[in-house]
Design a protein with these regions (language model features):
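Preference for protein termini
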Residues: 1-411
Length: 411
C-alpha cells in the first residue's frame, strides 16, 4: 500500500481543489487520510438499508398528505410551515442522506435522515478522488454522484435540462461553502449557468419569472433549511427569543406561488419541512398501523424506537437508554445523548426542553473500529436510489467535531 501523504501535503492537495479550504477546525485535523474500507457485502447491506428507509419516508409523506389534521394534531407546525407542506403537495425528495451505523449486534440502524439540506457532498467526492490512489484494491463508490445529482435535477424539471439555475443558501454562514462550490461545478460542467445568493436576493421579472440578482432562473437548488424560511421557534424554555423570528414571508410566498404556476422548480421541495422534522420518526413508531406491512417491518428493523417527548413521562426516561433530539436540529445540533452526558446535565435538558419540539430515541451501541472510533456512514439517496457514501468518525456523538474519512469498497 503506498504511504499516505503527511497532513500538510494533504492540506495542500485540498487547497488545490479550490473548494475545501478548511483542513483544520479550531486547530484540529478535520480529516482522516486512512479510508474506511467496506467489504462488498457491507456496502450492499448499507445500500439495502438506505433505500427502504427512503421508502418509509415516502409512505409517511403520503400518510400526512391524506391526513392533514396531523400537521396540527401531531407535528404542531406553524402557519408558514404548513404553507410549505401544502404547497408542495407531498413532494419532498430530490437528494437526501441516510445516516447509518453498523451496530455491536450486527444490525444496521439509522439515527435519522437529512432530507432537507443534506451536506458533505464535496468532502465525500473530493476526499475519495484525492486519496483513492493510496488505497489499492478498492473502488471509489462516489464517482457517479455528480451525474446522478444532475439527472435528478433534469427529471425534477420535467425531463428538460435546466439552462439557468440558482443555488440559494445562507450566505452569512461558511460551513457549506465547499458544497455550494461543487454543486456549482457539477451544473456548469453540464452547460447550466449558475447564480448563487440568499433568499433576500430573490425577485420576479415583468414576465413573472423568478430572478436572483435580477437574472431569471428556472431552477432553485435550495440549501436554506425549511425551518429558517418559516417562523423561528425556541426549543428550550430558558432560551432567548430569536432576533429574527419572523418568517421570510415575501421570499417564501414568491417561490411557492411561482412554483405553483409552473414558473420555477425548487429542489429539495419544500415538503421536506415534514420529513426533516424529527417527529416523523415518532410518527413511524406511534402510528405504525398507518404504514404498509412492509414499511412497518422496515421501521422495526432500521429505526430505533422514537417517541414524542410530549407523549412520555420524562421522569421515567433512563439516561443510559435514550437520546433527546429537537425537531429541526441537524448534524448533531440540539442532540443530547444520554449515555454521553452527566446525570445533572440530563436532568437539566429534560427540565428545559419544550416537549412539543423534542423526541426521545432509543440509544444503540455502534461497533467501533480502531482507536475506538465509531463510523457514521451516510448513504446519499438521489431519486430514492443509493448513490454514494459519506463517512464521519467520532468517539461519542456525531457532531461538527467528527472527523471525515474517505470511503472505499474492497475488490
Amino acid at each position: 500500500m503506498p504511504a499516505l501523504p503527511d497532513y500538510g501535503e494533504f492540506a495542500r492537495m485540498l487547497y488545490g481543489t479550490c473548494m475545501i479550504s478548511d483542513p483544520w477546525l479550531s486547530g484540529a485535523e478535520r480529516f482522516r487520510l486512512q479510508g474506511l474500507v467496506l467489504t462488498s457485502s457491507q456496502a450492499d447491506a448499507l445500500r439495502t438499508a438506505a433505500e427502504p428507509i427512503g421508502w418509509i419516508y415516502h409512505e409517511l409523506a403520503e400518510i400526512v398528505l391524506e391526513r392533514p389534521h396531523l400537521l396540527d394534531d401531531f407535528f404542531q407546525l406553524t402557519p408558514f410551515q404548513k404553507a410549505m407542506w401544502l404547497a408542495a403537495e407531498g413532494r419532498w425528495h430530490g437528494i437526501a442522506r441516510v445516516d447509518l451505523f453498523l451496530c455491536d449486534d450486527g444490525r444496521i440502524r439509522s439515527c435519522e435522515m437529512n432530507s432537507d439540506t443534506p451536506s458533505g457532498e464535496a468532502e465525500a467526492v473530493l476526499l475519495n478522488e484525492l486519496l483513492h490512489p493510496y488505497h489499492p484494491g478498492t473502488t471509489d463508490p462516489n464517482t457517479a454522484l455528480a451525474e446522478a445529482f444532475w439527472q435528478m435535477l433534469v427529471m425534477q424539471c420535467g425531463d428538460v435540462a435546466p439552462e439557468r439555475a440558482a443555488i440559494i443558501y445562507p450566505t452569512d454562514l461558511p460551513e457549506d461553502l465547499s458544497m455550494i462550490a461543487i454543486y456549482r461545478q457539477w451544473l456548469e460542467a453540464r452547460g447550466c449557468r449558475v447564480i448563487i445568493g440568499s433568499p433576500y436576493n430573490l425577485g420576479l421579472d415583468a414576465g413573472g419569472r423568478v430572478t436572483v440578482f435580477e437574472h431569471p432562473v428556472e431552477l432553485i437548488v435550495r440549501h436554506y433549511k425549511t425551518d429558517w424560511w418559516g417562523e423561528r421557534e425556541t426549543i428550550w424554555s430558558n432560551q432567548q427569543e430569536f432576533a429574527d423570528a419572523e418568517p421570510l414571508a415575501r421570499e417564501l410566498l414568491l417561490l411557492l406561488e411561482a412554483e405553483s404556476a409552473g414558473c420555477v422548480t425548487v429542489v429539495n421541495p419544500f415538503g421536506a419541512v415534514v420529513t426533516q422534522n424529527k417527529l416523523s420518526l415518532a410518527l413511524m413508531w406511534e402510528h405504525r398501523e398507518l404504514f404498509s406491512a412492509q414499511a412497518s417491518a422496515w421501521i422495526a428493523e432500521y429505526i430505533p424506537e422514537t417517541r414524542r417527548l410530549s407523549a412520555l413521562n420524562a421522569t421515567t426516561l433512563r439516561r443510559e437508554e435514550w437520546v433527546l433530539k429537537s425537531d429541526y436540529g441537524c448534524e448533531g445540533d440540539s442532540v443530547v445523548v444520554g449515555p454521553f452526558v452527566k446525570p445533572a446535565d440530563w436532568a437539566l435538558a429534560l427540565a428545559a426542553a419544550i416537549p412539543r419540539h423534542w423526541v426521545a430515541q432509543r440509544y444503540f451501541e455502534v461497533a467501533p473500529i480502531e482507536d475506538d472510533l465509531r463510523p457514521n456512514v451516510g448513504v446519499y439517496l438521489i431519486g430514492g436510489r443509493a448513490a454514494g457514501f459519506y463517512t464521519r468518525l467520532s468517539r461519542k456523538a456525531t457532531d461538527y467535531t467528527a472527523v471525515t474519512a474517505p470511503t472505499f469498497i474492497s475488490i
